[in-house]
Structures are given as C-alpha cells and as structure tokens.
C-alpha cells in the first residue's frame, strides 16, 4: 500500500473539519534508508566502510593468501566496496539535485545488485569465520597465525552484510510497491 490514513498515522495538525471533507491520504514516498535519501546514503557509506575495513584487516595479515576462504573474503569485500561506493555516489548526487531514485528499472538493478553482493558477502564472512574457528579451536594454529586479525575481518564483513541486507530489503520493498 502506498498511502497512510491520517486518522491512524496523524501528520501535522489536522482538525475534525478536514476529515469531514473526505479522508486525507498521505503518501509515503521517502522512508528512511531508501535510495536517494540521507538514510540510504548512510547505509551505503556504512557498507563500503565496513567492507574496506575487512579488506585492510585481512590483507595486513601475513598468510591470508594461503587460504582460499580468506582470499574469497578479500574478493567479495572488494566487490561490496565498489558496489556500495558507486551507489553512495549516486545517492549523494540524487540528494544534491533533490531528485528521487524511484525509477523501476533503476530500483530493480539495485535490488538484484544488492542481492548478489549480499549473498557473496555472507558466504565470504561465513567461510572466513568457519576457517578461523577451525584454526583456533580444533587445530590450535592461532599461536602461529594472526587469528584475531582474521576474526576481526570476518566481523567487519558480517557488519557490511548486515547493512546491505537492510538496504536490499528496503529497496525491494520500494520496488515491489511501485
């Protein structure tokens, strides 16, 4: 549904006289977190900052190239960084020219791109966390490796995935309501 009844969700100071003329319909065009809003920009900035942190933390480890899960995390977070940075620039541009990003073709591109990057990010974060738990709890390699660094990188990847998941759901909601 694309509208809200002011009796249920009052906006401003409406008198009973206004309601006798017929129901007032208030459109919900800009919900927080939608593309082209301040909330959407904040989500995108958080996504690319956490992705960048995951990359930097992982790459500064000595032996990350020896393990496929760690290399996959760097690749997935690089894609996440590029996607979120590009959309943050687009959100900034939309805010500067005061135009919304409600084109259905554009929204469908955002939804599919968010789903792909969210899936890759979650897979990378889970595989990195799994390998790190294996090294720490089962193989006792953490005395020889930088396990805490890898755990922190996985945590940053999970935070980036959480933000892109929120952004993906909000964009899908907007796209489905068009």
Swiss-Prot record:
Domain of life: Eukaryota
Topology class, membrane: Multi-pass membrane protein
Cellular compartments annotated: Cell membrane
GO cellular component term of the entry, any: plasma membrane
Keywords: Cell membrane, Glycoprotein, Membrane, Transmembrane, Transmembrane helix
Glycan-linked positions: 66
A Pfam family per the record: CASP_dom
TM regions (residue ranges): 38-58, 70-90, 105-125, 155-175
Residue intervals on the Extracellular side: 59-69, 126-154
Side of membrane Cytoplasmic, spans: 1-37, 91-104, 176-178
Family of the protein in this entry: Belongs to the Casparian strip membrane proteins (CASP) family.
Subunit structure: Homodimer and heterodimers.
Name under which the protein is recorded: CASP-like protein 5B1
Species for this entry: Ginkgo biloba (Ginkgo)
């Amino acid at each position: 549904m694309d509208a809200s009844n002011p009796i249920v969700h009052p906006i401003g100071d409406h008198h009973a006289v206004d309601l006798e003329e017929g129901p007032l319909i208030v459109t919900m065009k800009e919900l927080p977190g939608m593309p082209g809003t301040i909330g959407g920009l904040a989500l995108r900035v958080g996504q690319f900052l956490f992705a960048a942190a995951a990359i930097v933390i992982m790459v500064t480890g000595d032996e990350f190239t020896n393990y496929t899960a760690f290399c996959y995390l760097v690749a997935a977070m690089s894609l996440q960084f590029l996607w979120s940075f590009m959309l943050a620039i687009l959100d900034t541009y939309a805010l500067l020219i005061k135009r919304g990003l409600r084109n259905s073709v554009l929204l469908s591109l955002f939804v599919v791109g968010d789903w792909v990057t969210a899936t890759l990010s979650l897979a990378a974060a889970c595989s990195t966390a799994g390998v790190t738990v294996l090294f720490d709890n089962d193989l006792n390699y953490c005395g020889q490796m930088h396990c805490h660094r890898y755990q922190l990188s996985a945590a940053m990847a999970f935070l980036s995935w959480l933000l892109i998941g929120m952004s993906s759901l909000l964009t899908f909601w907007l796209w489905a309501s068009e």
